[in-house]
């Protein structure tokens, strides 16, 4: 199938979100990439811009990446759900956690991205991202210490979504979550550099690079 294009996501109606959102928001970054970050869904600013992580959570994520010593341009960044899930409150579009069926509907696009990006490590940021990547709902705090493997062979690391840092109840908790995010990103980056590409991934990319007779 290949990495889904923006026109493909714009026209997607696998769930009801595609008809409500402004546009689909594809992932962004190099292909292949050893490290892939998966968030929950586009926010209001991402929905309008058509790009992932351009709002407050995105700015915090890029600061965390820099602090972890990671070049954001070398990382593929995407979301488990490709359209903005929201509810209207007056004139404001407020974030609404995507339903299980919406995450599952977008699974075909996330699987295609993982196939095309061929990461050695996938970082699932938040519970919804874990559902998208692993197909099961896990508590982030517990999953951070788990050794998870995606069916592609890629390692899966769990961490907090940047928006969870921004929503922290007080400054000490915000500092705690931010430090955990930076630490998890650094550990994932180091693991991605050490890990061997999964045999299945190598075979797939070799097949793509082989000229057709």
Model region roles, listed by residue range:
Residues 1-213:
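A polyanion-binding, active-site-adjacent surface
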């Amino acid at each position: 199938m290949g990495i889904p294009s923006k026109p493909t996501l714009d026209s997607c109606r696998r769930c009801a979100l595609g008809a409500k959102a402004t546009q689909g928001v594809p992932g962004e970054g190099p292909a292949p990439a050893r490290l892939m970050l998966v968030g929950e869904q586009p926010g209001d600013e991402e929905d309008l811009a058509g790009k992932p992580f351009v709002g407050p959570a995105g700015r915090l994520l890029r600061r965390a990446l820099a602090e972890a010593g990671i070049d954001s341009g070398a990382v593929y960044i995407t979301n488990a759900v490709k359209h903005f899930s929201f509810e209207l409150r007056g004139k404001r579009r407020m974030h609404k956690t995507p339903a299980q069926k919406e995450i599952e509907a977008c699974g075909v696009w996330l699987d295609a991205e993982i196939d095309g990006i061929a990461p050695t490590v996938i970082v699932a940021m938040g519970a919804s991202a874990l559902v998208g990547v692993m197909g099961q709902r896990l508590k982030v705090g517990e999953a951070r210490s788990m050794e998870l493997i995606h069916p592609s062979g890629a390692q899966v690391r769990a961490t907090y979504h940047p928006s969870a840092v921004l929503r922290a109840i007080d400054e000490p908790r915000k500092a705690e979550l931010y430090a955990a995010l930076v630490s998890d990103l650094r550990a994932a980056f180091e693991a991605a550099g050490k890990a061997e590409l999964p045999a299945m991934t190598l075979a797939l990319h070799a097949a793509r690079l082989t000229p057709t007779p």
